[in-house]
Regions:
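C-terminal active-site subregion of NodB/CE4 polysaccharide deacetylases
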Residues: 1-64, 70, 172-289
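Metal-dependent polysaccharide deacetylase catalytic core of the NodB/CE4 family, i.e.
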Residues: 4-16, 23, 80-206
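A structural preference for long, well-packed, hydrophobic secondary-structure segments
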Residues: 32, 51-53, 57-62, 69-76, ...
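A short, Lys/Arg-enriched amphipathic alpha-helix followed by its capping loop at the start of a domain
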Residues: 35-43, 78-82, 157
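Generic enzyme active-site microenvironment
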Residues: 64-65, 161
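Short acidic active-site motifs
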Residues: 73-74, 148, 211
Length: 289
């Protein structure tokens, strides 16, 4: 077991932001994060990017964000306080088209569970009504505006990296579209500095052996959300996805639990469920993650 940690965060909600209308569990309080990083620092962890984790002594904690919510900018104060370089794995479609994330729109407007991997994200975006596109256009749910992202990406602690253009999980029938998703995403990122073009975060954390082989032929590191630690030489980095303490318990406890056999097995079962074409269709009648 490796002591190095790679954390996956999605949203940060300041007291000034409106209440979330979807996926409340993803919104982390800044104060809880500051307490977590102070605790990790006191335990001897140093903060670094995964690609720089071999340098220096002691265990490493790496911090990543997925998707591109504009509220990611709230993390800069914490990052500066603790000297934390971090990665934002960005979905470019939402910034380019200025539309909130489809899974939030779905949860806010429909009763059916979010289908995760059995639908075309691009087609869903194209089918949105004007009202659906603006329903969640608040500082809580919206993506970065282009000018905001440009300013954010210029910060020396910020590094952008690809996460797919529309966030389409690259499994089942959508594996054949992987090249298009990646090319559009990387082309969009060319305009920014400090882009980690050799790092890729799997949309929804879903993967198969075939996809893994294909991605490792193109990227140096790919990132899951399977939990546990990592070694600096790992090319598949299993991140720990943190949720609001009201849903998952204290953040430090969530990290410890991610190393447990039960947690890892549950994540593998979930990955199998949504990566398999037949099972992903059946998942429409279950509970989406």
């Amino acid at each position: 077991m490796h002591d190095n940690l790679c954390l996956c965060l999605h949203c940060i909600r300041s007291d000034r932001d409106p209440e979330p209308k979807a996926h409340r569990e993803l919104f982390l309080p800044p104060g809880e994060l500051e307490a977590l990083f102070a605790s990790l620092r006191d335990e001897g962890y140093r903060f670094a990017l995964p690609g720089e984790s071999e340098a220096g002594d002691g265990p490493v904690c790496c911090v990543t964000f997925d998707d591109g919510y504009c509220n990611t900018r709230h993390f800069l104060e914490t990052a500066e306080k603790f000297g934390i370089p971090f990665i934002l794995f960005l979905n470019s479609y939402n910034v380019a088209h200025q539309v909130p994330f489809i899974w939030d729109i779905w949860e806010a407007t429909r009763r059916e569970p979010w289908p995760v991997s059995s639908v075309s994200y691009r087609r869903l975006y194209e089918s949105l009504t004007p009202d659906e596109k603006t329903l969640l256009a608040t500082d809580t749910h919206r993506p970065f505006a282009p000018e905001e992202l440009e300013a954010f990406a210029a910060h020396p602690l910020v590094h952008l990296a690809p996460h797919g253009h529309t966030h389409q999980p690259l499994v089942g029938r959508y594996l054949e579209k992987a090249g298009i998703e990646l090319d559009e995403n990387l082309t969009f990122l060319e305009r920014y500095e400090r882009v980690l073009r050799e790092d890729f975060s799997l949309p929804c954390g879903l993967y198969t052996r075939r996809l893994t082989r294909s991605l490792l032929a193109r990227f140096k590191r790919i990132y899951t959300i399977d939990g546990g630690g990592f070694s600096p030489k790992d090319r598949v980095i299993h991140r720990i996805s943190l949720v609001h303490p009201d849903y998952g318990g204290p953040l430090r406890e969530q990290i410890r639990n991610s190393f447990g056999v039960k947690s890892r097995l549950m994540r593998k079962a979930q990955n199998l469920r949504y990566s398999n074409r037949l099972l992903s269709r059946l998942s429409l009648f279950g509970t989406a993650p």
